[in-house]
UniProtKB/Swiss-Prot annotation:
Pfam families: Alpha-amylase, Alpha-amylase_C, CBM_48, GlgB_N. Keywords: Carbohydrate metabolism, Glycogen biosynthesis, Glycogen metabolism, Glycosyltransferase, Transferase. Catalyzes the formation of the alpha-1,6-glucosidic linkages in glycogen by scission of a 1,4-alpha-linked oligosaccharide from growing alpha-1,4-glucan chains and the subsequent attachment of the oligosaccharide to the alpha-1,6 position. Transmembrane segments: none annotated. This is 1,4-alpha-glucan branching enzyme GlgB. The lineage of its organism: Bacteria, Pseudomonadati, Pseudomonadota, Gammaproteobacteria, Enterobacterales. Belongs to the glycosyl hydrolase 13 family. GlgB subfamily.
Length: 728
């Protein structure tokens, strides 16, 4: 028995309860020379090897049959590079000792990570292929400050937590280890003795790729190369740009007909991308593609925030999909979920045995609606983890925008909570000050680091300044979903036309607050689930009236100020609710031409016409870009307004939300002349009744609605028409 290492230390090391393996393992100076110690379970013989010559310098003595070896190299005083020749089951292997390498994380990185100001923590934490002292391998780093011991386990060490315990950097709470020979494509996890003495297996929070569910291991893979933002992609996100978003759940847009299995990222690149381009959309918005264990969460309960889900292929396959979208002229928006995470024990929940990422008090840290945990935004390392993730998707994948989910649940402490179920902030208020600061900081950093990328907030309350700059007291988002507009207009459209006259304000109210935010008008996935019916099925009347009302509504929506968002299936009037376990009802477009084809053609024409005419998008957020011409004709449910571009060019939009055609409907206009009908939702091309104005109509010098000149139009039943003034 050696007197150099205490038996209790050897026992603790072998049992996996020793927190400082580098103080024992590796090469150490002693009075007798350099001593090399190694923990190599199941080994029978171990030699220290001179790499250049292959000469055996010393044989290590087995001090414990469970695999602890030690030996002295006399007359050597200075550390040198060495290898170990290890005999396992009669076979000799030459390995590099992971415990001969010094600290991995640079002092500045460690300081920035501790301060929560490391803009790109994913470049340091996680698993990264590297070469150290001429040796190739992988460096692992994980933040677990309260764990008693952390080891890397994986395919490279038989998932044995004794073989690769990590070094704790006490100043930052980060554990680190370089493992020679570990390479891309291998599975790994972190095995730890947590703060309470329990053994845990955890996926890497910073894993760049993960196993296909239900398996939960992380994959070693390098950081993807940075994607350069082009000027075209930047311009497509600007406030004066036409933005028409096709919102997609990749797992149910279309499936293989023979087995109902998902399309891969590459198949989606070949099918979804050209379809969205043909339909005239400018942006694709993807429901969360971060790795998540439960299909039914639609991705909104992620466990691998840095890993694209393996359901549809590899990380590189996802990059291929995004590249294909960009090549087709489509910007890509990613739904991003920094508001909460699931309770699965392999992921972030009680990561090191403490409430590391979440609040400890369930009144702050538990979301009862979704059975999820809420991030502790006041903890610097947690907010850094999330801010870094936002940058990661934009810089490393070329994501053009992030749509932030459930912002209201983040910024209000009493969100969906009764009295006594929440804790006021330090001033006694209901606002979550830490979450507000986190959102402001995230938007500020994105604006500074990736100018041209934007964020969009799904925020369901009247919290002021969501899309206003931070220096004006806002949250700093570029856009906000207008959920109030969506609810009001859908409530109006589901009414029998007889009763719409009594709810006229539901269509006009939105203009009273339209310029308080930069709005996106969303008809999202949330509106076609949970018994709400499809958008088509909410329309009243028989089939003709349902389709006519839907077309009129789309014509109204595309003309109303604000960017557009339509969930998949709505573009061809899917009749049933969305089912995440099945394909869209593409069979509705099979066979002869029908009403569904008509709606699909209308949406395509709406997109193309909207994009072509600057008046329809250039001044969405400027009052000069909109003016009511007829706002008070509630008895006939008629509304008429103009959209205007910076040069003063106007487009007239007229909607009739009753099934009664309105002939010789006169209203005052600003610009006399000849007006051409450029879109009519009642056109026979869309399977309407084909009522209209024969292409063009001339104004009259007849005063109406306080204006000197006027138009007399036929307003088709349940329809919206757009007219543009012809040049003289």
């Amino acid at each position: 028995m050696s007197d150099r290492i205490d038996r209790d230390v050897i026992n603790a090391l072998i049992a996996g309860h020793f927190a400082d393996p580098f103080s024992v393992l590796g090469m150490h100076k002693t009075t007798a020379g350099l001593e090399v110690r190694a923990l190599l379970p199941d080994a029978t013989d171990v030699w220290v090897i001179e790499p250049k010559t292959g000469r055996k310098l010393a044989k290590l003595e087995c001090l414990d049959s469970r695999g602890f070896f030690s030996g002295v190299i006399p007359r050597r005083k200075n550390f040198f590079r060495y290898q170990l020749a290890v005999v396992w089951h009669g076979q000799q292997n030459l390995i590099d000792d992971p415990y001969r390498f010094g600290p991995l994380i640079q002092e500045m990185d460690a300081w920035l990570l501790s301060e929560g100001t490391h803009l790109r923590p994913y470049e340091t934490l996680g698993a990264h292929a590297d070469t150290m002292d001429g040796v190739t391998g992988t460096r692992f780093s994980v933040w677990a400050p309260n764990a008693r011991r952390v080891s890397v386990v994986g395919q490279f060490n038989y998932w044995d937590g004794r073989r690769h315990p990590m070094r704790l950097r006490k100043e930052s709470g980060i554990w680190e280890l370089f493992i020679p020979g570990a390479h891309n494509g291998q599975l790994y996890k972190y095995e730890m003795i947590d703060a309470n003495g329990n053994l845990r297996l955890k996926s890497d929070p910073y894993a760049f790729e993960a196993q296909m569910r239900p398996e939960t291991a992380s994959l070693i893979c390098g950081l993807p190369e940075k994607v350069v933002q082009t000027e075209e992609r930047k311009k497509a996100n600007q406030f004066d740009a036409p933005i028409s978003i096709y919102e997609v759940h990749l797992g149910s847009w279309r499936r293989h007909t023979d087995n109902n299995f998902w399309l891969s990222y590459r198949e989606l690149a070949d099918q979804l991308v050209p379809y969205a381009k043909w339909m005239g959309f400018t942006h694709l918005e993807l429901l969360p593609i971060n790795e998540h264990p439960f299909d039914g969460s639609w991705g909104y309960q992620p466990t691998g925030l840095y890993a694209p889900t393996r359901r549809f292929g590899t990380r590189d396959d996802f990059r291929y999909f995004i590249d294909a979208a960009h090549a087709a002229g489509l910007n890509v928006i990613l739904d991003w979920v920094p508001g909460h995470f699931p309770t699965d024990d392999f992921a972030l929940a009680e990561f090191d045995g403490t409430n590391l990422y979440e609040h400890s008090d369930p009144r702050e840290g538990y979301h009862q609606d979704w059975n999820t945990l809420i991030y502790n935004y006041g903890r610097r390392e947690v907010s850094n983890f999330l801010v870094g993730n936002a940058l990661y998707w934009i810089e490393r994948f070329g994501i053009d925008a992030l749509r932030v989910d459930a912002v209201a649940s983040m910024i209000y402490r009493d969100y969906s909570r009764k009295e006594g179920e929440w804790i006021p902030n330090e001033f006694g208020g209901r606002e979550n000050l830490e979450a507000i600061e986190f959102l402001r900081n995230t938007n500020r950093i994105l604006g500074e680091q990736v100018s041209g990328a934007v964020t969009m907030a799904e925020e369901s309350t009247d919290f002021p300044g969501v899309s206003r700059p931070q220096d004006m007291g806002g949250l700093g988002f570029w856009y906000k979903w207008n959920l109030g507009w969506m609810h009001d207009t859908l409530d109006y459209m589901k009414l029998d036309p007889i009763y719409r006259q009594y709810h006229h304000d539901k269509l006009t109210f939105g203009m009273l607050y339209n310029y308080t935010e930069n709005f996106v008008l969303p008809l999202s996935h949330d509106e076609v689930v949970h018994g709400k019916k499809s958008i088509l099925d909410r329309m009243p009347g028989d089939a003709w009236q349902k389709f006519a009302s839907l077309r009129a509504y789309y014509g109204w929506m595309w003309a109303f100020p604000g960017k557009k968002l339509l969930f998949m299936g709505n573009e061809f009037a899917q009749a049933r609710e969305w089912n995440h376990d099945a394909s869209l009802d593409w069979h509705l477009l099979e066979g002869g031409d029908n009403w569904h084809h008509g709606v699909q053609r209308l949406v395509r024409d709406l997109n193309l016409t909207y994009r072509h005419h600057k008046a329809m998008h250039e001044l969405d957020f400027d009052p000069y870009g909109f003016e009511w011409l007829v706002v008070d004709d509630k008895e006939r449910s008629v509304l008429i307004f103009v959209r205007r571009d910076k040069e003063g060019n106007e487009i007239i939009v007229a909607s009739n939300f009753t099934p009664v055609p309105r002939h010789d409907y006169r209203f005052g206009i600003n610009q006399p002349g000849k007006w051409r009908e450029i879109l009519n939702t009642d056109s026979i091309h869309y399977h309407g009744s084909n009522a209209g104005n024969g292409g063009t109509v001339h104004s009259d010098e007849i005063a109406s609605h306080g204006r000197q000149h006027s138009l007399s139009l036929t307003l088709p039943p349940l329809a919206t028409i757009w007219l543009v003034r012809e040049a003289e």
